[in-house]
Swiss-Prot record:
Pfam families: Glyco_hydro_56. This is Hyaluronidase-1. GO terms for cellular component: extracellular region. Glycans are attached at residues 48, 111, 256, 392. Expressed by the venom gland. It catalyses: Random hydrolysis of (1->4)-linkages between N-acetyl-beta-D-glucosamine and D-glucuronate residues in hyaluronate.
Amino acid sequence: MTQNIQMTEMYQIILFASILAAISATSADFKVVWEVPSIMCSKKFKINVTDLLTSHKILVNQEETFNGDKIVIFYESQLGKYPHIESHGDINGGMLQVSDLANHLKIARDNISKFIPDPNFNGVGIIDWEAWRPLWKYNWGRMSEYRDRSKDLVKAKHPDWSPAQIEKVAIEEWENSAKEWMLKTLKLVEDMRPNAAWCYYLFPDCYNYGGKDQPSEYFCKNDIQEANDKLSWLWKQSTALCPSIYMQESHITKYNTSQRAWWIYARLRETIRLSHPNTLIYPYINYILPGTKKTVPSMDFKRVLGQIGSLGLDGAIIWGSSYHVNTEEMCKEMKTYVKDVIAPVASTVIQNVNRCSQQICKGRGNCVWPEEPYTSWKYLIDPKNPTFKHTNISCKCKGGYTGRYCQIAP
């Protein structure tokens, strides 16, 4: 009994100190960003969700534009002259090794000025290049053509070389070219719009397509982690990381609730491992199951957003394509899902993340539950002001603060 009283008193003291410190501290900033072309619903069918979203603290571009003041995404045809191969032929030279990087950067500069006219843009900027991968070994399936043609380029210069020699140099030339293209493009957007958080969509990946009855079975394999370590140049230069944790229909049919949580945790765990202290992390999440017109089950949406928050991350990007809003029926379904699921869940998670930050982390970081990595999301989806116990929590500190509760100034 005495011990319980002492623990209660200690908690109250820490809580009071946290509230006092919060007066002058910077609040945790958990951002949920809307990246769905819902403007199509507004224009075609007079179905608007902006007020619903913004009233629940979800960030929406002004006038619902797909690219705007909160978020901008550059697809393959929108930033410079991105070289890649399509079924109907080569685009912008096809192969990185023989394409004009200088011209690409020149045109990209104009694209950036057009798409982001405000030099003080401080939203999230995403480069979405998916036609090839920078590491040789991951250009499989339809991407294997990049490997074949890279070897052809080397063989044309050195027809007397052995296949092993050709492949060795082809790998070096491909990976060096990919690094140069990705880094110089990233540096350009960061130089031109330095206040934004910049990332490449889908990076890092975990390729964790299988798993059974243990959480560790879903973790990124050692060889995947070693490959991701080879991209250290990308993690160092990126000011944000934007992995995908899209819920698939196969996840619902193949995995139970715990397994789905393990799968997502594994991908976020790898992102955290690779991130630098000041790197922001904004995972991409979805509300429509890819390849279908079915919405993500409401409990899964709650868990996913709660997981992101409970790992101390900076927010999430809710994505949807024009395909999801091209009929009145789809627009009505979107509005219903926003009203019943997205808006209340986002509002609750944002509020709980910020409240825990103020109470436990002095407003200098976000709460993390180290001993409950797979279930701590439940604390953040509770709309009834749950109690946060400092004994269960460590803080992911920001702004140079350190210590378990960010109590040590930089």
